[in-house]
């Protein structure tokens, strides 16, 4: 019993840092017409941080390939926003034959305080033969618990998927993400969250 309890405690400690730091808070899917079959989607992350943009678009390309969809990274095919007019962008999208365009952009930032637990020391039951040993154990099962407050930066972003031939909005929503300076991990987790939801909503 002691070994099983210890294994469970270790598992909890190992899994906690892996919990998702990106969550979808709102989403909408077009339902009054069939969802088209996608072959080629242009991914545009409207971000000032080029490293996050590149990591995110690269990961989206990799994940979409699992669904036999070619994800096109905007940082590889489009110049900076301030160097392209809307008419030119439309022409490029039309000529390239994209089925859809997925646009992601941050909307707002806010601070939130999170209570982070340090550790809990467990003392599993030893004896149940008589009342007083059990009574003593019951009050010592949790002998110590510590925590501290951590301030996080929450990035609110929106995502919109448009069909290119008629500019119809097919899929839309908002996310909250705990900002991290580990840009690679941040971008990959965000991409994974979006693709999982795309599949769940039967968009892909």
Feature map (PLM): residue ranges:
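Bacterial N-terminal signal peptides
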Residues: 2-13
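Flexible domain-boundary/linker segments
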Residues: 77, 110, 118-121, 176, ...
């Amino acid at each position: 019993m002691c070994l099983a309890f210890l294994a469970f405690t270790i598992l909890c400690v190992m899994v906690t840092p892996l919990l998702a730091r990106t969550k979808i808070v709102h989403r909408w899917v077009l339902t009054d017409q069939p969802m088209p079959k996608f072959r080629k989607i242009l991914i545009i992350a409207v971000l000032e941080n080029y490293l996050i943009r590149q990591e995110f678009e690269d990961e989206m390309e990799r994940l979409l390939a699992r669904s036999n969809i070619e994800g096109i990274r905007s940082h590889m095919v489009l110049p900076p926003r301030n160097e392209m007019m809307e008419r030119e962008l439309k022409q490029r999208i039309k000529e390239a034959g994209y089925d859809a365009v997925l646009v992601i952009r941050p909307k707002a930032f806010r601070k939130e305080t999170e209570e982070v637990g340090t550790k809990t020391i467990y003392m599993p039951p030893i004896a149940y033969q008589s009342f007083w040993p059990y009574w003593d154990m019951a009050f010592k099962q949790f002998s110590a618990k510590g925590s501290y407050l951590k301030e996080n930066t929450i990035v609110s972003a929106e995502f919109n998927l448009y069909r290119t031939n008629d500019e119809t909005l097919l899929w839309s929503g908002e996310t909250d993400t705990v900002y991290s300076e580990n840009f690679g991990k941040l971008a990959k987790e965000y991409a994974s969250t979006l693709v999982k939801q795309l599949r769940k909503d039967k968009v892909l």
